[in-house]
């Protein structure tokens, strides 16, 4: 069920609070990336990619987990979202021979990258709310259907400087 995507605060309460949820999310990235073959009888590509990514049990090639990195935003740990988002983009999206995940269900993997590179992500599609990530570009502008522009500025952005100090929308601080 995708109910937890619509109610991350409720998920946090069910897990015992923000600290407990943070520990569970952290463990996904630090647990050994061990696996069993299950009914397949062989290593499927999602498992091979999880092992190659070397981020614990986080299997980016398995689309239902891709939003999980952004759940840190909902518990007041946006720097962990920013760290892991950039790490996935650096390791899995590049021009080398292994620069793209082997699984692309309905454009989800590409959409994850496009949104993440812009610096925000729709944790629950269909809900007009976005979690903050780590933009790749120093500046980008989206031209909206109503003729307005939405501009993301990440001044000083670099591989080493990937963390957001503050985010403004209509002059209101959001981080």
State what each model feature region is.
Residues 3-4, 175:
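Short, small-residue-biased leader/transition segments that mark boundaries at the very start
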Residues 5, 10-55, 88-93:
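Extended glycan-interaction surfaces of carbohydrate-active proteins
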Residues 14, 28-38, 58-173:
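Non-catalytic C-terminal accessory modules of carbohydrate-active enzymes
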């Amino acid at each position: 069920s995708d109910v937890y995507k619509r109610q991350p605060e409720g998920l946090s309460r069910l897990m015992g609070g923000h600290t407990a949820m943070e520990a569970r999310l952290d463990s996904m990235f630090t647990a050994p990336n061990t696996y069993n073959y299950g009914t397949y009888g062989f290593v499927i590509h999602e498992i091979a990619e999880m092992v190659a990514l070397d981020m614990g049990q986080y299997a980016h090639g398995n689309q239902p987990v891709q939003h999980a990195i952004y759940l840190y935003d909902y518990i007041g740990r946006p720097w962990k979202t920013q760290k892991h988002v950039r790490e996935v983009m650096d390791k899995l999206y590049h021009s080398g021979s292994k620069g793209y995940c082997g699984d692309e269900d309905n454009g989800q993997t590409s959409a994850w990258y496009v949104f993440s590179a812009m610096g925000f992500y729709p944790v629950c599609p269909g809900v007009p709310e976005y979690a903050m990530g780590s933009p790749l570009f120093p500046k980008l502008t989206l031209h909206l259907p109503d003729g307005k522009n939405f501009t993301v500025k990440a001044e000083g952005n670099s591989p080493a400087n990937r963390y957001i100090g503050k985010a403004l929308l209509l002059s209101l601080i959001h981080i």
